[in-house]
Amino acid sequence: MCRIAGAPRTLLPLLAALLQASVEASGEIALCKTGFPEDVYSAVLSKDVHEGQPLLSVKFSNCNGKRKVQYESSEPADFKVDEDGMVYAVRSFPLSSEHSKFLIYAQDKETQEKWQVAVKLSLKPTLTEESVKESPEIEEIVFPRQLTKHNGYLQRQKRDWVIPPINLPENSRGPFPQELVRIRSDRDKNLSLRYSVTGPGADQPPTGIFIINPISGQLSVTKPLDRELIARFHLRAHAVDINGNQVENPIDIVINVIDMNDNRPEFLHQVWNGTVPEGSKPGTYVMTVTAIDADDPNALNGMLRYRILSQAPSTPSPNMFTINNETGDIITVAAGLDREKVQQYTLIIQATDMEGNPTYGLSNTATAIITVTDVNDNPPEFTAMTFYGEVPENRVDVIVANLTVTDKDQPHTQAWNAVYRISGGDPAGRFAIQTDPNSNDGLVTVVKPIDFETNRMFVLTVAAENQVPLAKGIQHPPQSTATVSVTVIDVNENPYFAPNPKIIRQEEGLHSGTMLTTFTAQDPDRYMQQNIRYTKLSDPANWLKIDPVNGQITTIAVLDRESPNVKNNIYNATFLASDNGIPPMSGTGTLQIYLLDINDNAPQVLPQEAETCETPDPNSINITALDYDIDPNAGPFAFDLPLSPGTIKRNWTITRLNGDFAQLNLKIKFLEAGIYEVPIIITDSGNPPKSNISILRVKVCQCDSNGDCTDVDRIVGAGLGTGAIIAILLCIIILLILVLMFVVWMKRRDKERQAKQLLIDPEDDVRDNILKYDEEGGGEEDQDYDLSQLQQPDTVEPDAIKPVGIRRLDERPIHAEPQYPVRSAAPHPGDIGDFINEGLKAADNDPTAPPYDSLLVFDYEGSGSTAGSLSSLNSSSSGGEQDYDYLNDWGPRFKKLAEMYGGGDD
């Protein structure tokens, strides 16, 4: 318990005892006590008090939570108390001693029980020289005394009193350090004590906020406090002697930081967005805006109130919305929200603390944007009462008409999108309406073909709706219904055959020129005078013809049921009907002729080839009949052997097994192996019956004990078919032709090779390749050549090695002669003679050829030549006057000359 200095000191021991009891009984649970928790509430105010100014707040402890109390002031003319305990000034007045104290009563409304508490108002001191000099009145806290034992037990007092907390306003301007309270022990009379405080704000972070004079025990604050940072400090005071021994138990000191209105409200968002459906009733919730205040929310400084400062636009009413001043809920208060007129509202919201007091409260603003959402309150309306369109007959998926509507709702929403339906005039469902998603128009489309000859015009009744129902209370106007007049345009249609296909039944075998039926087509265009002509489109067997005018179908060939063009007894022919309209149209029809069978096919033996043994046992031949007719013109069949030739019945016998099968056996004991043609008479069951002699080729062979043929090769050779023989002969002829062509080609190639040999350059041919020397002169007169040597140059034996002697400088060196490939035999000697004569003739007639036959003048080459002077050479002179034996030394190429001019008798 705190007291003012100068109060009766007799209360100090009691306070100390109570404090000691509270410290020792800290583990006990304090009992709740209904009433005011404080004995005195105090507030420090300025000199001038204004009307409506909040002064302080009192708290009432309602333990059971069920009491409803009502506050009253002992000075109702000056002060009033709100339901939450906030004390306001009723009028403006200067603070004086007569207003410094008054009482506040709390009365239970049900039990009428009453409680009271004192309120003390203090004037905020002004720093003058006198006030500085005067010692302020400082509260004093005394350590409780040590309790003595009574009857051997430590006495403990009830905890009816506790040390009240120290209330210190935030943002104090000082001067600092500012004294708060003095802590003292009763033992300071006998002992020299030292005081200290511990805890956050003293020796713990934030350190240095509170300090204590260790000798006097004066507790002071060193700087302004901020409640928004730390709202309460919990310190412990200690008292020790000069030796550091504890002389008092520590006491707790609680310092409450009194909130000051130093923070404005702050909205969580500067711009708030909300929506409300158009046409909403008053009282419809829209949105909630929220602001926070850093000041004490339990005090006036943190109690906010909201209000709407402005609304834009102000139509249809300037007060379309209101706001709950405590919760910030925005609701509608007026009707008439219409999105088609106003799509968005902008509200300026203000939040003010001090419970919205405009004089002392701090305020802030934010913007609330409310969008009016669309509802389906505008039905679609047609732009015209009647729409017109036309469509050619037999056309589908054609847009007939384009329906246009207007809808004031928000485009491309379910409340704007139109849905069209046909409510009348189309019982067969020939039309449908689709919605264009971009323009919202209705596209009337034909979904079923329309026949002009049946319906020439349609009058449709159409209605337009939205994808969602209309808002409550909205009705569809007459403009939501319209009519569509559709005109059908006549077009030239295809002629059609009826029935199609047309089926007729006729016997096969009808002769050419028989009229089968009339196959005509109908023209659906009854109102057009048109002619139809007929043509044949498909007739696989070319049996039919159709009259181009009347459509009569006549045969031009015999109808045959057994034809490959007949499937399942039905012959199909297709015909074309064309009109002369603009444009001309055509249609096809199919005629199906079901051909009835007649007995026009004789039966044949099956199989046509068989084999059996030379003796009747152990096998026989099973045969049946093949008849292209069907019942009853086919089986059962009758099998028999002809009377002629007589060998047939003498050698063979036939036995009927049933209506379809018979058995052929040898009648004699032995028949030589070979191939036999056995005629068999087969008769069907038609009316009249039809017979046929069919040949069965039977191969008779030697058989083993099992009845199997053993001379298969001979039978196979004897039984070779005509086609196989022809194929073999053709192959042989082709091979002979190929061999002959190859021989001719080889001979022609040899001739070409021989001709090329004759055209070879003389310098390249070994047979006449005479070496060139420095002896120059005319041609040789003697042209009596030995052609046999030219024809067979390879027969000439190589000459022996030339003996050592004088050699010409132009003589070929002696070395191994090159081996030339052996040429083919030379052609006829006459060919070579002709070739040489042609060469000579060409050389004589060529003016650019070397003058081999002309007189040439040569320089003298000096002596030493065995030939002497060139002028002495005369090829026409007698050879006997000269010695040509040296030619034998010139090698094999001059051997012939040596033989001709050498020392022989020739």
From Swiss-Prot:
Topology within the bilayer: Single-pass type I membrane protein
Alphabetized SMART domains for the sequence: CA, Cadherin_pro
Pro-peptide region(s): 26-159
Positions of modified residues (Phosphoserine): S96, S135
Main location, first listed in the record: membrane
Cleaved signal peptide residues: 1-25
Biased composition (Low complexity): 863-880
UniProt KW keywords: Calcium, Cell adhesion, Cell junction, Cell membrane, Cleavage on pair of basic residues, Glycoprotein, Membrane, Metal-binding, Phosphoprotein, Repeat, Signal, Transmembrane, Transmembrane helix
Binding-site residues for Ca(2+) 3, renumbered to this chain: N261, N263, D293, N301, D353
Transmembrane segments: 725-745
InterPro entries for the chain: Cadherin, Cadherin-like_dom, Cadherin-like_sf, Cadherin_CS, Cadherin_pro_dom, Cadherin_Y-type_LIR, Catenin-bd_sf
Binding site for Ca(2+) 1: E170, D226, E228, D262
Residues annotated for Ca(2+) 2 binding in this entry: E170, E228, D259, M260, D262, D295
Ranges per topology, Cytoplasmic: 746-906
Chain ranges on the Extracellular side, renumbered to this chain: 160-724
Domain (Cadherin): residue spans on this chain: 160-267, 268-382, 383-497, 498-603, 604-714
Superkingdom of this protein's organism: Eukaryota
Cross-referenced PROSITE patterns: CADHERIN_1 (PS00232), CADHERIN_2 (PS50268)
Post-translational modification: Cleaved by MMP24. Ectodomain cleavage leads to the generation of a soluble 90 kDa N-terminal soluble fragment and a 45 kDa membrane-bound C-terminal fragment 1 (CTF1), which is further cleaved by gamma-secretase into a 35 kDa. Cleavage in neural stem cells by MMP24 affects CDH2-mediated anchorage of neural stem cells to ependymocytes in the adult subependymal zone, leading to modulate neural stem cell quiescence. May be phosphorylated by OBSCN.
Matching PANTHER family: CADHERIN-2, CADHERIN-23
Subunit composition and interactions: Homodimer (via extracellular region). Can also form heterodimers with other cadherins (via extracellular region). Dimerization occurs in trans, i.e. with a cadherin chain from another cell. Interacts with CDCP1. Interacts with PCDH8; this complex may also include TAOK2. The interaction with PCDH8 may lead to internalization through TAOK2/p38 MAPK pathway. Identified in a complex containing FGFR4, NCAM1, CDH2, PLCG1, FRS2, SRC, SHC1, GAP43 and CTTN. May interact with OBSCN (via protein kinase domain 2). Interacts with FBXO45.
Function: Calcium-dependent cell adhesion protein; preferentially mediates homotypic cell-cell adhesion by dimerization with a CDH2 chain from another cell. Cadherins may thus contribute to the sorting of heterogeneous cell types. Acts as a regulator of neural stem cells quiescence by mediating anchorage of neural stem cells to ependymocytes in the adult subependymal zone: upon cleavage by MMP24, CDH2-mediated anchorage is affected, leading to modulate neural stem cell quiescence.
UniProt protein name: Cadherin-2
Native organism: Otolemur garnettii (Small-eared galago)
